[in-house]
Structure formats: structure tokens, C-alpha cells
Amino acid sequence: MICSSLLLATILLPTINSAQNAEHDHYVSPWKTPWTYEQAAHWSELDPDYAACNAGKQQSPIDIQQTEKSPLPALRFEYTSAPLKYVINNGHTIRVDYHDAPQSGSFLIVGDQRYQLTQFHFHRPSEEYLHGKPSDMVLHLMHKSAEGKVAGVAVLLKSGAANATVQQLWEHMPATEGQQAVSGVDLNPAAMLPRATGYYTYTGSQTAPPCSEGVTWFVLKTPVEISAAQITAFATLYPHDVRPVQPLNGRVVKESQ
């Protein structure tokens, strides 16, 4: 019991020295108008720039119920180990930023489209629902092509064995909102992917203001395990950082064969 408590304490304890010794330890929010998840139904009323949050017809996340099986291209994850720029507590989630291209060195290839990984972040529980149910958490890996197209990969996370890469991140996440830490570590995000990369795909949006549409989402069908203690560590900071599911409005969700 004592060992379990010590393990949980180690997971929950932020790396204070990392934040204090960071090159920049204060995060500058990109949102000119503050928002919260509790205000999700009223985001469009907070700022005209958030109008798509209510007026948009291709919003995310969604509840994946019915799918159309299609001969879709395989997802090629050309991820590599690279130094992280910041581990950020932005007041809504824990987000990891990469340096500008080509320094991240990690790419998603879908058919003839090439996207660079720009950042990733977490939600608890998952924003994506499968047949009416969320997963314990979700990892969102966000990518952008040279033409400016955005692609998000959702990796569902479920309680099970501890994930060493997630643990590495948790050891560097700032406990205080508005702080960012230069981690000084290399990390390969491929270690947070499942072996099987079959997926669901649809056209959606960012899941936070300004809710910009035109995002191609790939929701991986196979979940990845993280430990209950790792889920608790995140929940201590963000127990419920999710946007409610949005109407499909006639959109078709395709499923890889």
C-alpha cells in the first residue's frame, strides 16, 4: 500500500525545477477572449471569432455510430524522436509543442498528402464517442500540411498498463495554469500509437474555440493503455476537459477496411 502511494505521489508531483529553470515559464494564451468548457454551449456568444462553434455544420467531436467501410489509404506515421519545445499547462489541457518545421521531423502520410506534426494534447474523458461511450482519455495529435490543411489523429486511451512515454511527459507537466516548461528531453510520439492503425475518418473542426472547420479527423480504432494512476495524475489538473459531441448534420463517417 505504501509503495502504491509513493508511486502515485511520484506521478502526481510536477517537475518544479524544470518549470523554474525553463527558458520561458509563462505561457501566452493565443485566445484574446477567455473561455471554459462549462461555457461550451455559448462559445459563439463570447467572441465573434467563435461564431463557427454554433453556426458551423461540420463540428467536432462526434459520436461514431454508423460507418461506411471503404478502401481507404493506410496511415503512415513517419514519426521520429525530437526535442520537445514546451510542455504547456494552458488552462484547458496539457499540450506539447514542437519547434517550427522542419525541426519536429515527424510526419503523417495519407495517400499523397503529407502533414507535419505540430503539437499534441490530451482530454479526459475522450471527446470522441464510440457507440455512445467515451474512452478514459484521448490523445490528439495535430498536423498541418505545407498547403495549410489540418489533420487530427485521435488515439483513444484506456486504463491498463502504464505507458512509459506518457509517464515521461507527466514528469514535466507544470501544475500551475499558464506555465510552460522546456522539457529538455527527446520524445518519439510513435510510442503512444497502437500497433494496428485502422481508423474512422470524417471532416470536422477544432474542438475548442474558434472551432475552425475543415479539419480531417482520423480516429484510431485500437486504443492504447495507460495506467489508472496516470489518468488520475491528469485528472488532478483537468478532470473534465471535453467539448460535448456535435450533430453529424448528414456527414458520413468512413471506416478503413
Which functions belong to the PLM regions below?
Residues 1-8:
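Sec-dependent signal peptide recognition
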Residues 4, 16-257:
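Alpha-carbonic anhydrase
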